[in-house]
């Protein structure tokens, strides 16, 4: 009974520590700095917004009577060989349909600035006319900062209370060729809605326009909890809880419940991944996708193999056990690897990755301690049974669920 209580205490510690680490998040607030900025050209704008990603700022003056929008887009903290873009999307949120202004420094010290309509995810940002008139287009590059100035002639009646969809972006260059921007982290978050009258800006997803980022987060949470935490925890329960005789057959049902729950949640996460892939034809994460498909396939085989599990005394039970353990540990390894792959794609705040690393470290430490404790209990039990057994034939009663 004491052995059983010790193991249960370890498992409770796993659950508590996992919960604490998973909710240990901090909120990052953005300091308003655009209002203090002074343009060298003495330009003055009525309003400004600190954009939440990519170290960017938008200064603007909106004339609702004429539909004229005068803007200064500032992109700071740039390294050499970078291009930047700011766009209005008249038809939807996001990249496709955006009417962009693109700028990048040239080798002669000047800045090339031009307009580019974006019609697909495979855009090369070629120069072209926008769906509205643009005048006064210019750009400067100084102190690792590009400033783009332009006047846009929007519709006098925007039809949605003066709100526009905006997108801003940056990427690397090869010579004078623009390379695709990164497809993870802040580069996929840089969309928002802006009310030109009130000056209120909000993330596009929060405004109801685009739910892609929210779907990515849901996908990550579902798969992180299922494949990355519950699957390893279920394996720990099966391996170490059954050493306590009083836990037989409870350990088996706890193990099945944990793994079945992980599978159901994991399938939901896998399905959201397929949906995200279908909604983003120009964005591919081949390794992450391949591991995800392999995980789903192996886990599905593992679930259905339970219906073919021989009885403990059957001659084929040994082979089934070898298969079950091999597939199970493969799923755990692939699951953890793919969670880290997903974190690399999402590029969330550092606390998320640190929290997951903490959970995995805790699980690994607990598993190591339980492994040593289990061997101690088993060896001690066998010695005791050898002393008390008649004719040396008794090696303990085997669980029918093992």
Curated annotation (Swiss-Prot):
Residue ranges that the Swiss-Prot or TrEMBL entry lists as coiled coil: none
InterPro entries: AIR12_DOMON, Cyt_b561/ferric_Rdtase_TM, DOMON_domain, UCP037471
Cofactor dependence: heme b
Cellular compartments annotated: Membrane
GO terms for MF: metal ion binding
SMART domains associated with the record: B561
Residues annotated as domain DOMON: 54-171
Cleaved signal peptide residues: 1-31
Membrane protein topology class: Multi-pass membrane protein
Top-level taxon of origin: Eukaryota
Keywords attached to this entry: Electron transport, Heme, Iron, Membrane, Metal-binding, Signal, Transmembrane, Transmembrane helix, Transport
Major location category of this protein: membrane
Function: May act as a catecholamine-responsive trans-membrane electron transporter.
Protein's name in the database: Cytochrome b561 and DOMON domain-containing protein At4g17280
Biological classification of the source: Eukaryota, Viridiplantae, Streptophyta, Embryophyta, Tracheophyta
